């Protein structure tokens, strides 16, 4: 790191748990930045032309991982344990109460965006991107209450026992 404040903090961190991390970028960023005219127009309309979105393009993340970031294949390891929780699917059935955790409208949106992604995705990130850095602690259905999948939205909410799992892990 180039910032003199960080080594002291880094030396004290023993474990990081990342929820659906974007270690490998997302094809959704590729689509809204450099996709067909419909995808780019949609990205513009929704305000997804920012530098943050550009940096999540798969090719940009490949470059970061190859040159700068630690913990990915063929790179130095991280100074402390980096564990990930991977979300593998999205459910948005109107009759299923689980679909409302984190907001039903968000689930529907992630069902749509899942069409640009692999069959294993949380609606925003492919499982391969989420599991690229560090060690996978678990993939959603293997530990969540009821074996429920965690969408990208749900992995940031109080859904399916996730907060208790995190609390018990720490």
Q: What is the meaning of each model-derived region?
A:
Residues 3-170:
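Helical cap/lid subdomain of alpha/beta-hydrolase-fold lipid enzymes
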């Amino acid at each position: 790191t180039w910032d003199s404040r960080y080594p002291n903090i880094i030396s004290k961190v023993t474990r990081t748990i990342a929820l659906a991390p974007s270690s490998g970028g997302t094809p959704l960023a590729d689509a809204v930045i450099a996709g067909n005219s419909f995808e780019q127009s949609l990205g513009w309309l929704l305000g997804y032309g920012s530098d943050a979105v550009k940096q999540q393009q798969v090719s940009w993340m490949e470059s970061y991982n190859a040159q700068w970031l630690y913990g990915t294949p063929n790179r130095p390891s991280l100074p402390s344990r980096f564990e990930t929780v991977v979300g593998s699917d999205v459910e948005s059935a109107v009759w299923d109460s689980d679909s409302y955790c984190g907001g039903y409208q968000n689930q529907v949106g992630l069902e749509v965006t899942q069409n640009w992604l692999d069959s294993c995705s949380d609606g925003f990130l492919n499982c391969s991107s989420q599991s690229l850095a560090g060690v996978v602690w678990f993939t959603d259905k293997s530990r969540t209450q009821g074996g429920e999948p965690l969408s990208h939205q749900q992995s940031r909410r109080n859904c399916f026992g996730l907060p208790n799992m995190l609390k018990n892990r720490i």
